[in-house]
Amino acid sequence: MAARGRRAWLSVLLGLVLGFVLASRLVLPRASELKRAGPRRRASPEGCRSGQAAASQAGGARGDARGAQLWPPGSDPDGGPRDRNFLFVGVMTAQKYLQTRAVAAYRTWSKTIPGKVQFFSSEGSDTSVPIPVVPLRGVDDSYPPQKKSFMMLKYMHDHYLDKYEWFMRADDDVYIKGDRLENFLRSLNSSEPLFLGQTGLGTTEEMGKLALEPGENFCMGGPGVIMSREVLRRMVPHIGKCLREMYTTHEDVEVGRCVRRFAGVQCVWSYEMQQLFYENYEQNKKGYIRDLHNSKIHQAITLHPNKNPPYQYRLHSYMLSRKISELRHRTIQLHREIVLMSKYSNTEIHKEDLQLGIPPSFMRFQPRQREEILEWEFLTGKYLYSAVDGQPPRRGMDSAQREALDDIVMQVMEMINANAKTRGRIIDFKEIQYGYRRVNPMYGAEYILDLLLLYKKHKGKKMTVPVRRHAYLQQTFSKIQFVEHEELDAQELAKRINQESGSLSFLSNSLKKLVPFQLPGSKSEHKEPKDKKINILIPLSGRFDMFVRFMGNFEKTCLIPNQNVKLVVLLFNSDSNPDKAKQVELMRDYRIKYPKADMQILPVSGEFSRALALEVGSSQFNNESLLFFCDVDLVFTTEFLQRCRANTVLGQQIYFPIIFSQYDPKIVYSGKVPSDNHFAFTQKTGFWRNYGFGITCIYKGDLVRVGGFDVSIQGWGLEDVDLFNKVVQAGLKTFRSQEVGVVHVHHPVFCDPNLDPKQYKMCLGSKASTYGSTQQLAEMWLEKNDPSYSKSSNNNGSVRTA
C-alpha cells in the first residue's frame, strides 16, 4: 500500500512539473512575441482622440522626428512598390499656418503622394516645425501670394526639374488623394506640355476685368494646379518678366497667363476637370467640406477648401474608412471565388469561406419555423414602419438609417453610371418612392428599393425621361475582427498571476526558473479588487417582497464574489411606506452577515419621487464616482457590472442600457409553473424597453454637468426622459445597447389617477405593454372567439437563455 501511495504522489508531482514546463515553453514565448510585435491601438471610446494623439507624437522631416505614416515609405498601400520620383508637390502656406493647416496636410494626404511634398513659406519662417519647410528668400506672407507662387515654381525648376515628371502647386487647405492622382497622371504623357486643373474664367463680377481674350482661361489655384516637366522648363526662365507684367491681383490668373505666354499651352478645356479638381461652391461658405457622403467627393482627386485642421483629419479618416470598405468588399469577392473554384477543383470548402463566400440571395437563411422568419420593415423617404414588438408602428427615420440609405443609393448610382460615357447617357437619382429593409444577423443588411430616376441621353437625340426601377441590394457582413483592448505584456501578466497566487515552496529553485507561474497556496494574501467601484442607488418605498428578491440577487452577484460596489438604499420615510421597519431589519441582517460589505440606508423625506431620491443619493459622492441608477424590481449579473464600467467614460459617455422586461408569467405560461430563470429571452417571455432610460451608468461629474434631475417631478416616470434629453443637449455621447445582464422582473403595475396626465398616460401604456406579446394575446383572443382556430398549428419554439 505504501509503495502504491508513493507511486500516486510521484505521478501527481510529475504531472505538475510537465504541465508547468509546457506552459513556460508555449504560453510565455507567445506572449513575448505579441509584445515584440508592438503595442496595439486601444479599442476605446476615445478612438479618434487616440489616433490624433498618436499623430501628434510624430515628428517631421527635420531631426529624428518623422510624421505619422500610414504605410512604410516607398510602399504602396495595396502592397506594391511605389515610384518616389514621380510627382513633386509644392504647398503654399504662411508662418501663421505652419503649426495648424500645414501640419494637418503633412500628417494626412502627404503620405499618399508618389514623390516629394514640401511647404513653402515666407523668408524667416520657423523651420523647427515637424514638416519640411522651405523659406523663400525675399518673399513675405502678404496676400495675394503672387510672388510666393512664382518663386516656388522657380525653386522647383532649379532643384528638382530633372528628378520628377510632374509638378503640382497646392494650397495648405486642400486634400489630395495621392493614389488616384498617380493613376490619373500615369495615363498621360509627361513629356508633352500639359497644364492641368479646374478651368476658370472668373466670377460674373470679374468678367472682362481679368485681361483674358476670348478663348483664354486659367487653372484655378484652390483645387490645385499640375504642370508637366516640359511646361515648367519652358515657363520658369521668363518668371521675372511675368512678375513685372501682371494685370490682376489674382495669383492663379497670372500663373495661367505666364504659362500660356511662354509654354504655349493653357488650362485644359475639359468638363471632367471640374469633377476631378473639386471646389466646394456652397452658398454659405464655412471653409470646410461638410457633406462627405457624396458621389462628388468620391470621384474627385483633390478637394478644396478645408481650412480648419480638425475637418482635414475628419476628411482623411473618412477616406481611410472608404479604403477599408473597399478592401473588405475585395475579401468577400475572394471568398466567393474560392467557393466557386472549389467546386471545379473538387476540394473541401472551409467553413469561413462557405460563410463569407455564399452568393448574394435573399434566401441565404432558411427559417425552420414561423418564429425564425425575418420580417421586413417598410420605409419611405421619411418614415419607417415596423411590426416588431416593442417598436412603434411608425417612427421617423433616424440619422444612422438615413445615412446608410444615402450611402447605398450613392453606391448604386455609381454602379449604374460606371459606363455612362460609352453608352451616351447618364442617370440621376431623384428619390426613394418606397422600400423594404431587414437585417440578417448571419449575413448582412438587405434592401428592396423602388427608385425614381432621371434618364438623361446626351448622344444622338437628347432627352430627359423619368423612370422607376427596383433595386435588390445586400450589404454582406465581412469577417469578424477582434481588437485587443490592451496590449499584452508577458512580464506584467506573469507578475500579476504570481501576485494573486502562493509560492511553489515544494519545488526547487531550479524548477522555479523554468516555471514563472505559481500555484495557489496557504500564503496567498487577500487582494483588494482593482475594478472601479460602482455605487448602486435604489429608491425604495414599500415593495418589501421585491426588496427581498433584489437583496438575494445582490448577495449572489456582488457580496459573495466580493465585487467592488456600494449599495445605497434611498428609503422614503413617508406614512405611505408600511414596510419601512422590515426593510431596515433586512438590511441589518445582511450587514451582520457581510460586515466588510459597503451598504447603507439613506432616509429621504416626503412622498415618493424617484428623481428626488436619486438626486439626494448622488449628492453623497464626488465627481469621480461611478453611479448606477437601479430599481428594486431588477435583477442583474456580474457581467453587467463590468459593462457598466467599460461603457461609461467620465466627461465623454453615459451608458443607458436597453433592458429586457418580462411579460406576465400567468399569460406566458398559461397557468403552468413559471420558469425560475429570469434570463430567458424570447418574443414570448418579454420585450426590450427601447424607450426606457431609467437604468443608467453615469459619473457624478457628468450628472452635475448636465444639470442633474428635475426634482419637481413627482411619482412615476418622466425623470428618466428628462435626464436623457439633458445628456444629449450637453453634447455627451449616449451608449445604448440591449443589455442581457439586466432583467425587469414582472410585477403588477398600479397607475395612480392623481398623477400628472402625461405621467398617467405613460404609466397606462407601460402597464398595457407588460401583459404579453402581440402574437400570444392574439392567440388567446382567437381561442376564445374563433372555434375553428387550432393552437396545434402554433409552434412556440425553443427558449433561448443567457
Swiss-Prot record:
GO terms for molecular function: glucuronosyl-N-acetylgalactosaminyl-proteoglycan 4-beta-N-acetylgalactosaminyltransferase activity; metal ion binding; N-acetylgalactosaminyl-proteoglycan 3-beta-glucuronosyltransferase activity. Its EC number is 2.4.1.175, 2.4.1.226. GO terms for biological process: bone morphogenesis; chondrocyte development; chondroitin sulfate proteoglycan biosynthetic process; negative regulation of ossification; positive regulation of smoothened signaling pathway; proximal/distal pattern formation; response to nutrient levels; sulfation. Keywords: Disease variant, Glycoprotein, Golgi apparatus, Membrane, Metal-binding, Secreted, Signal-anchor, Transferase, Transmembrane, Transmembrane helix. Its cofactor is Co(2+); Mn(2+); Cd(2+). InterPro entries: Chond_GalNAc, CS_glycosyltransferase, Nucleotide-diphossugar_trans. Glycans are attached at residues 189, 623, 796. GO terms for cellular component: extracellular region; Golgi cisterna membrane; Golgi membrane; membrane. It is a single-pass type II membrane protein. It is found in: Golgi apparatus, Golgi stack membrane; Secreted. Divalent metal cations. Highest activities are measured with Co(2+), Mn(2+) and Cd(2+). Has both beta-1,3-glucuronic acid and beta-1,4-N-acetylgalactosamine transferase activity. Transfers glucuronic acid (GlcUA) from UDP-GlcUA and N-acetylgalactosamine (GalNAc) from UDP-GalNAc to the non-reducing end of the elongating chondroitin polymer. Involved in the negative control of osteogenesis likely through the modulation of NOTCH signaling. It is linked to Temtamy preaxial brachydactyly syndrome: A syndrome characterized by multiple congenital anomalies, intellectual disability, sensorineural deafness, talon cusps of upper central incisors, growth retardation, and bilateral symmetric digital anomalies mainly in the form of preaxial brachydactyly and hyperphalangism. This is Chondroitin sulfate synthase 1. It comes from Homo sapiens. The gene is CHSY1.
